[in-house]
C-alpha cells in the first residue's frame, strides 16, 4: 500500500456554512437525516446550536439547490452523486448563499432610494412639479409619517425663503428705509413734508427776505402778496434791530418765542384771523391805545390786531395762516410803537384818517427815505367801529 486512503466508492460530504467549507468522508452509506444533522452540529461546533433551525440543501448536476427534509431525500441525493455537496441555512438566513444576500441588499437599497425621492419631492417649491417616482405598494406606516413630517418642513422652508427674499427687495423696503432714516435723525413725517421754518430775525425786515419767505409760504396757485409799508419795515428792521430783543424781554415773551420758530406761522395765523373774525369794533381802539401807553403789559398779539387801522385797503385773504409768513409779523411787532394815536379828546376823527400818524420821538430816518403816511380809505376789517374815547371791553378768551 502506498499509505493513501482509498476513497473510491465511498461517500464524501462537502458541507458549507457561510464561508466555512468542510469535507467529510462517510463510511456508512446508510446514514439518516437526524444523524446528518448531529454530524453538522459537531463539525460546525460553536456556529450551530441545538435550538437553531437548520435547513440542509444539496446541489444536483444542474447546480440547483434541492432541500433535504427526511432520510428518503438524503438517500436519493447519495444515489445521484458520490460527492454530496451540502449547504446549511440557519434560522432562515441566506448567509451561505451569496446571491440571496445580493437580493436582500438590493431590496433594502430600493427602499432607501424611494425614501430619498420622497424627501426631495417634499423640499421642492409648490409651483414647480417634482419628478414622479413609482412608490411600491408595500410601504409601511413609518414611511408615511416621515413623508407628512417632511412635507410640513418643506412648506416652512419655502416660507422662510420667501420672507428672506422679500427682505432684500429694494422696492418693497423703501418706505421702511425712509422711516428708519427719519427716526434716526429724530424727525417726523410732518416736519419732513412741511415747509421749512423761518430762519433768524436779523433778516426779518429786508424786502428780499420778505419776498422769498412769502413766496415759499404761499401754496402753489395762490398769488403771493407783499405786505404794506415796505419802506417803514426796511427802516424799522435796520434801525431797531437791536431794540426788538429788548422789547421782547420787557414784554415777557421773549424767552418763549425764539425756542419754537417752526410754530410761529401757526400761532400768529390763528391769533390774527381770530382778531378780525370774532372780536367787535370797540376792542381794537382799546388794544391800540393800550399798546402805545403800556407796552410791557400787553401780549404780542395786539400789535397785529391794531395794525390794520393804518394799512390801506387790501383783500382779507392776505392775513390767512398760509399766506402770511412769520417774517412779516416779526417786522411788524415793533411798528406800532413808532406812531402815537390821536388823543381821546377828538371823537370826531375817523380811524382811517392819517392825522394821527406821527413818528416816535428819537426816531431818525435814513437819508434818502421819506416817511409818508398811508393813504386813507375805508378799512375792510372795521365792523361798525365807534370812534376813540368810548368804553372798551377786554378781549375774549379765544384771543390769547
From Swiss-Prot:
GO terms for biological process: COPII vesicle coating; endoplasmic reticulum to Golgi vesicle-mediated transport; positive regulation of canonical NF-kappaB signal transduction. The modification N-acetylmethionine is found at residue 1. Residues 10-91 form the PB1 domain. Residues 150-160, 328-340 have a biased composition (Polar residues). It comes from the Eukaryota. Ubiquitous. PROSITE patterns: PB1. SMART domains: PB1. The record marks 193-194 as: Breakpoint for translocation to form TRK-T3. Changing residue 149 to S: In a colorectal cancer sample; somatic mutation. One of its GO terms (cellular component) is endoplasmic reticulum exit site. Residues 237-258, 265-298, 307-327 have a biased composition (Low complexity). It is linked to A chromosomal aberration involving TFG is found in papillary thyroid carcinomas (PTCs). Translocation t(1;3)(q21;q11) with NTRK1. The TFG sequence is fused to the 3'-end of NTRK1 generating the TRKT3 (TRK-T3) fusion transcript. Self-associates to form an oligomeric complex. Interacts with PDCD6; promoting localization and polymerization of TFG at endoplasmic reticulum exit site. Interacts with SEC16B. Plays a role in the normal dynamic function of the endoplasmic reticulum (ER) and its associated microtubules. Required for secretory cargo traffic from the endoplasmic reticulum to the Golgi apparatus. This is Protein TFG. It comes from Homo sapiens (Human). The gene is TFG.
